[in-house]
């Protein structure tokens, strides 16, 4: 696939098996070279830290976009495209398709962060696996005094 979209929240929760390293490896195995996977992740709980760290364990290239109080992670199967290339494509698609939401405006919200730096993503966050995925517990523990840049 060129694109896989994951939006599996049921109320405030997401099924734990859709946030594990093994799940993301299966997703990656089904992506074409240069394909992307996008997933909505709520940033206000410790689950965000573990989810991002888990995604990054399979997809080392991640972009982040703000979306109505949530963060959409976009992970790449292969190298990321340059900012200039993405901007040119966004402008072309905006003009060609008259989309409801401007891709150029969304691209302006693009952020990249260092996963291992510990400044935004908690250095103690655990990678979620099929054998260890306390999703509901992490979802219920609020993150304090940190904001996504």
How would you describe each model-predicted region?
Residues 12-19:
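Glycine/threonine-rich flexible loop motifs
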């Amino acid at each position: 696939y060129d694109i896989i979209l994951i939006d599996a929240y049921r109320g405030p929760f997401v099924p734990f098996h859709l946030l594990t390293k093994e799940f993301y490896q299966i997703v990656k195995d089904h992506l074409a070279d240069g394909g992307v996977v996008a997933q909505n992740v709520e940033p206000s709980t410790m689950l965000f830290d573990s989810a991002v760290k888990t995604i990054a364990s399979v997809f080392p290239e991640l972009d982040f976009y703000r979306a109505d109080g949530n963060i959409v992670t976009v992970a790449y199967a292969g190298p990321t495209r340059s900012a200039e290339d993405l901007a040119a494509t966004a402008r072309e698609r905006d003009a060609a398709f008259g989309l409801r939401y401007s891709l150029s405006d969304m691209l302006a919200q693009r952020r990249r962060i260092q996963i291992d730096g510990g400044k935004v993503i908690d250095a103690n966050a655990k990678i979620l696996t099929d054998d260890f995925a306390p999703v509901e517990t992490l979802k219920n523990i609020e993150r304090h005094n940190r904001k996504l840049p």
